[in-house]
Each structure stands twice: as C-alpha cells, then as structure tokens.
C-alpha cells in the first residue's frame, strides 16, 4: 500500500505507551457515538463505524464496553468536535480534528503545539480548501478492476481503486463509505486494514533535512494531545 496508509496501519498497531493514548481516544469517540444515538451498533451506524475502526486498532474489549456502559449511564459529560488549521515548514499544511470536553483548553494546547514546534496557526478555511474529504478503504487484494466493478454494481459512488503490492485502496465519496463496506462484505471481503474518512491533500510537498525533522516534531506534538483525534497533512511519504 502507499506509504501514507502504511503509516496509518503502523499507528494502529503501535506498542507500549502509544497504545494507551490510542485506546483512550477511541474510548471518547465510542462514548460520543453511543451517547448521541442508540448504544447498539446495529441501530447506530456512527457507532458501528467507530467500532469497526477500533477493531482495526486492536482496542481491547474492556475499553469498548466501558465507553458504551458510560454512554448508557446518566453522565452529563459533553464533548464538542473542533477543527484547527495551520502551517508547518516550507509549504506544509496541517488540519487538526479534535473532540473535547473543554474547548478553551484544547484551543490553547493546539496553538502551543504549533508555536513551539516551528508551525503557525491559520484561520478557519486557510488550509482545508486544499484538501478533499474522501472515504478510504484498504485491504489485501490484487484485482482493482474487479473491485471497481463490484462497487459500481452496488451503486457506490467510487472515485478510484488502486492496487499496489498486494493491497487494494478504494476511494469513495464520504457519504458512500458505509455503502462501499457493505458491498465489499457482500462479495466476501471481511478483513480491512483501513476504513476511514480522510482529508486527502490536492497536492503534496516533500520535506528534507531540518524541515522534515521539524515537521515530524510538530505532528508528534499535536497527536500527543489527548483531545486530538486526527491530524491530516500534505507532506509526501509520511
């Protein structure tokens, strides 16, 4: 698969301390999805999608159960989605999606991460117009044409299907991601490495040397924040 999706898979199978952060972030996401709808994935498509991704990230059952049980309770804890945009070195662009119970804290933390790691916060919309929201599905396979035909027959709005190194990558309109998954399952595909809604950069930049190291430090600082759910960028091979 492409380097970008290989990196996503690597993060999902990270070890030691990184796992606890990933599990905690999924716990919040599962809680919010269950709280906003029914705590049953069969009647709550948003929860079903989060649980699918949690499975890929090998989130333990007890973490999932705890989040769903919390949503069933009488807790009044409220989480708010947020998006921040900014710039790194040499034309690099970053989108940060958050889920937080304290917007002021999160905004300050994201701004600090940018400021202390060679980046600059931008205004809303200053970066996102250079990205396109897409559904992305990655799984083992080789015949891109056959997968494309399966999805077309299921009336899925599929944009592209790529095959590389024994891996299929499907790009769909974001509203058709669930439909594409169901179509693939109906055709016998059960295991998926990536099922995500992604912000895909329209163009990428290549960083080297100090610029690349600075950028990696900035991304690490952003992803280390407990309130940050996803970080998107336009740097190639990262």
Swiss-Prot record:
Keywords (alphabetical) are: Cytoplasm, DNA-binding, Transcription, Transcription regulation
Compartments in which it is found: Cytoplasm
Any Gene Ontology biological process:
regulation of DNA-templated transcription
Q: Which Pfam families match?
A: TACO1_YebC_N, Transcrip_reg
Superkingdom, taxonomy of origin:
Bacteria
Question: Source species, please?
Answer: Streptococcus thermophilus (strain ATCC BAA-491 / LMD-9)
The entry's protein name is Probable transcriptional regulatory protein STER_0242
Instruction: Please report which protein family the annotation says this sequence is part of.
Output: Belongs to the TACO1 family. YeeN subfamily.
Q: Name one GO cellular component term.
A: cytosol
The molecular function terms of the Gene Ontology recorded here are:
DNA binding
């Amino acid at each position: 698969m492409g380097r970008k999706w290989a990196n996503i898979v690597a993060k999902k199978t990270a070890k030691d301390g990184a796992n606890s952060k990933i599990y905690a972030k999924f716990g919040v996401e599962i809680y919010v999805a269950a709280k906003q709808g029914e705590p049953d994935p069969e009647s709550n498509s948003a929860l079903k999608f989060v649980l699918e991704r949690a499975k890929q990230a090998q989130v333990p059952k007890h973490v999932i159960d705890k989040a769903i049980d919390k949503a069933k309770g009488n807790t009044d804890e409220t989480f708010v989605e947020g998006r921040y945009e900014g710039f790194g070195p040499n034309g690099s662009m970053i989108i940060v999606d958050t889920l937080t119970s304290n917007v002021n804290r999160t905004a300050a933390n994201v701004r600090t991460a940018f400021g202390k790691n060679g980046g600059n916060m931008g205004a809303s919309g200053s970066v996102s117009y250079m990205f396109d929201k897409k559904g992305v599905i990655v799984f083992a396979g080789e015949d891109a044409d056959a997968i494309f035909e399966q999805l077309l027959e299921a009336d899925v709005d599929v944009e592209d299907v790529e095959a590389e190194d024994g891996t299929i990558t499907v790009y769909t309109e974001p509203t058709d991601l669930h439909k594409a998954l169901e179509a693939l399952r109906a055709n016998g595909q059960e295991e998926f490495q990536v099922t995500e809604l992604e912000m895909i950069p329209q163009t990428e930049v290549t960083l080297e040397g100090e610029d690349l190291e600075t950028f990696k430090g900035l991304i690490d600082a952003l992803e280390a924040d407990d309130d940050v759910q996803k970080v998107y960028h336009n740097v190639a091979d990262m």
